[in-house]
């Protein structure tokens, strides 16, 4: 299926003043209400990575799980879950980070990766880059490497994709929005 950026962007709903005043939240749930759009998004990532050399897909809590799991299934790659603090039952590694909303903690099971593994880290959106940089730090703490950071949406004005690139993390997104795009 050919990727149609316009069609995808029209299904990403802007929600002004959520979760706090001044923020325009990019709601991807309408993408999941359209089987065609969901397939288009998932297939775009699958086609990009089908021949790539990496060992795992790491998906961010919670919206990163939705597409990340499809990609992992289609590419036959192990899926590791990066969760918000307190959501994983076994031994974890934890990393603090800043979001556009404040400080948070990201966790992963400490036995998720081995030395030498290579991880595609995936989220729905790159804003400040905090979540993906925290995930990259956790990957590196397990002596693995980050293959690439990927997301559906980039908000370049918030600087996250640039921070990732400055940290030597290759970055890929399907589309971008200006902060004032409605």
From Swiss-Prot:
Keyword check for Glycosyltransferase: yes
Predominant location: cytoplasm
Catalytic activity: AMP + diphosphate = 5-phospho-alpha-D-ribose 1-diphosphate + adenine
PROSITE patterns in alphabetical order: PUR_PYR_PR_TRANSFER (PS00103)
Keywords for this protein: Cytoplasm, Glycosyltransferase, Purine salvage, Transferase
Enzyme class: transferase
Gene3D superfamilies: 3.40.50.2020
BP GO annotations: adenine salvage; AMP salvage; purine ribonucleoside salvage
Subunit description: Homodimer.
Function of the protein: Catalyzes a salvage reaction resulting in the formation of AMP, that is energically less costly than de novo synthesis.
Family: Belongs to the purine/pyrimidine phosphoribosyltransferase family.
Name of the protein in question: Adenine phosphoribosyltransferase
Organism of provenance: Ectopseudomonas mendocina (strain ymp)
Taxonomic lineage of the native organism: Bacteria, Pseudomonadati, Pseudomonadota, Gammaproteobacteria, Pseudomonadales
């Amino acid at each position: 299926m050919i990727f149609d950026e316009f069609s995808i962007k029209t299904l990403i709903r802007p929600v002004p003043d959520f979760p706090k005043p001044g923020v325009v939240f990019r709601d991807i749930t309408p993408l999941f209400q359209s089987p065609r759009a969901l397939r288009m998004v998932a297939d775009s990532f699958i086609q990009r990575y089908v021949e790539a050399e990496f060992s795992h897909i790491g998906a961010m809590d919670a919206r990163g799980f939705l597409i990340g799991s499809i990609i992992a299934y289609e590419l036959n790659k192990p899926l590791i879950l990066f969760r918000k603090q307190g959501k994983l039952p076994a031994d974890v590694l934890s990393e603090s980070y800043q979001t556009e909303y404040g400080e948070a903690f990201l966790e992963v099971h400490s036995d998720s990766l081995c030395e030498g593994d290579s991880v595609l880290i995936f989220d729905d959106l790159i804003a400040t880059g905090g979540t993906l940089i925290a995930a990259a730090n956790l990957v590196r703490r397990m002596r693995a490497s980050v293959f690439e950071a990927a997301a559906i949406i980039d908000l370049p004005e918030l600087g996250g994709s640039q921070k990732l690139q400055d940290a030597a993390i290759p970055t890929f997104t399907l589309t971008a929005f200006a902060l004032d795009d409605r």
